[in-house]
């Protein structure tokens, strides 16, 4: 049996063959979403090359890439799920192997909060035929902070060990090596 719900003479919802359709309306701020629902999503892309020679995370412009995303978190109980697809390479100038590390950090200025350190995310061996070997690294982590409002996440890179190599992000500024980072607010 088909039917409808009216509020002040306006059809709000209708039912037909077991399917309920909400016709009009806006969800208010007191709506509670079931756990696991994605309620916000932001994504950013970057192809600006960055060369890093640091062997430790400096938390500044020497190691933080231009790849960042800001999400306006609504609920303190939500988690933020972060996905990052980063084009990374290690330039060893033909001198064997090298390893690049990456981490996701939160903040707009120092001190930053580390969300996840992906140690040794790209390891290369260059026998001398080429000077840089790279890969696309897919990084994923979650932030369980109770903070709300604008949260900004960055990709930071460094070299492993003390080798005098270069860790490179996103290729050659041609736009051919685009990396991305996305943030999702997930209800709990």
Q: Model regions: which residues?
A:
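Short, solvent-exposed loop/turn segments enriched in Ser/Thr/Gly
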Residues: 63-65
